[in-house]
Structure formats: C-alpha cells, structure tokens
C-alpha cells in the first residue's frame, strides 16, 4: 500500500533560524573582540588568563551578581581605575565612545 509523503519544512526552517542566530552571535562577539584589539584592551587583558590586568573571565565572575555591572565597567573603561585588581592602575580611555565602552563591557561580562 502506498503511503502519502508528508513534506514538512518546519525542521529545516528551525535549523536555519538556529544557524542564523548562532552566526549573528558569533559575528557580534568577533566584532567586539576587534573593538577590544583596536582600543589596546588586549595589551593588558586576555579572555582566559591574567596578563597585566585581570582576565575578562575573572572580571565577568566578579561582577556576575551585580545589577549595575555594565555601567560600572563602562565607567572603569572610560575613566580608568585603581585598586580593584591590585595597585596597578587601569588607564582611562576617554576617547572611547560610551556606546563602544558599553559594547566592550557587555562582551567582557559574557566571558565566563
């Protein structure tokens, strides 16, 4: 007996949607890494290991429970800071736009 073939496009569409979202997230993350390179963040920081400054994953862990973490990081990025991770100061980056500083802060907080 011949069974009618039921064609469904939902799994294919769902698969494409998931791939598209993953690609968008990866591109956004890559763009923020480029932004970090362009602004010399990676001269003192790395994602997973401590260099001169703390690893971004350690920053993300430290601020994970804080509701104002993004704003606090933006302030440190733009105005500099000292004493949060030892005695070595983090230089200010006042020429970095608030928007770009926020992108960097959000990217850093996802590093855990």
Each model region followed by its residue ranges:
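A general structural signal marking secondary-structure boundaries and capping sites
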Residues: 48, 67, 80-84, 111-112
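Axial heme c-ligation environment in periplasmic c-type cytochrome domains
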Residues: 43, 52-61, 78-105
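Conserved helix-turn-beta segment immediately C-terminal to the redox Cys motif
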Residues: 61-67
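Stable alpha-helical elements in mature extracytoplasmic
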Residues: 69, 73, 100-101
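Sequence/structural segment immediately N-terminal to covalent heme-attachment motifs in c-type
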Residues: 30-47
């Amino acid at each position: 007996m011949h069974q009618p073939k039921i064609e469904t496009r939902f799994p294919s569409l769902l698969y494409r949607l998931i791939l598209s979202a993953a690609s968008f997230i990866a591109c956004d993350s890559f763009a923020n890494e480029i932004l970090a390179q362009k602004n010399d963040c990676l001269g003192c920081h790395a994602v997973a290991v401590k260099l001169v400054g703390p690893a971004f994953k350690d920053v993300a862990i430290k601020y994970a429970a804080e509701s104002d973490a993004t704003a606090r990081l933006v302030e440190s990025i733009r105005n500099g800071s000292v004493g949060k991770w030892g005695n070595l100061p983090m230089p200010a980056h006042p020429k970095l736009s608030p928007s770009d500083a926020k992108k960097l802060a959000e990217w850093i907080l996802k590093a855990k």
